[in-house]
């Protein structure tokens, strides 16, 4: 029977962002990691409900409608695509509303490792640990990445647990992930995220997990502005993630992508050749006027007969030639 089988967490580590959860969901669907078949029994909770334990269950097969762990939690807060809870020092009194404290409540330096925002020139929390401070100053944005808005609103348990939950639907079946961790363990780099786990390096979430969900926030969106997706924290300092997919590209620096101006080739429209229409010159035939011969009127030559003497033409040596014409 499943009730007699020792319950083991699906994974040990810390889910930093949505992609970490999707890697675990994918590994479960592929059989590399195992869904849990049931909720932990009372006698098991002390051993399995602890920092680093991550449980994934499939709602239909397990029959789990509501996950229980017998820990007193604060009201939930939305943090990206997760719901986050923090362990309380004590349960609310019967009939007491779960109302957040006012500004005059417990100091945040006594609230589960979360401290007031440090100044910009203050030492990082690692140096505070080296100096022996139990709860050194840390940037408030790092706190919010770990606990959301649950910083100083309730009486949180010292070094208490934080619970993060996220759900997906695959082929119409709901799958749920429950993650436990302490702020101190995450800051100390004691918990590995799935994206940094060499054993899960080749796990790439299928498209139905990344595109087919009703997530409130984009998968790569940073939560609170401190722990950016694609960054892991070893001893509290961020380092580039080794995960090879695009889901964990660092978001710290967004280089401006200069889109080259699309070259618009000039389309040279060929000049439409307008052929010149040569109108043939209309041949005007030359009208040859028929030459009308105008006969020249020739005056008849009046022949003056010469008088020959003895058959010879007389000479005019005497200069009186007219005498020979009959003149006087």
Swiss-Prot record:
Coiled-coil stretches? none
For this UniProt record, the keywords arranged alphabetically read as follows: Nucleus, Transcription, Transcription regulation, Virulence
Q: Give the record's GO CC terms.
A: nucleus
Where is the stretch described as Disordered?
94-120, 251-293
| Skewed-composition ranges (Low complexity) | 106-116, 251-261, 282-293
Stored InterPro entries: Gti1/Pac2
Annotated localization:
Nucleus
Example GO molecular function = DNA binding
Q: Which Pfam families match?
A: Gti1_Pac2
State the family named in the UniProt similarity comment for this chain.
Belongs to the MIT1/WOR1 family.
What this protein is reported to do is described as: Global transcriptional regulator of transcription that impacts, but is not absolutely required for secondary metabolism and pathogenicity on maize. Regulates synthesis of multiple secondary metabolites, including fumonisins and fusarins.
- The entry's protein name is Global transcription regulator sge1
Originating organism = Gibberella moniliformis (strain M3125 / FGSC 7600) (Maize ear and stalk rot fungus)
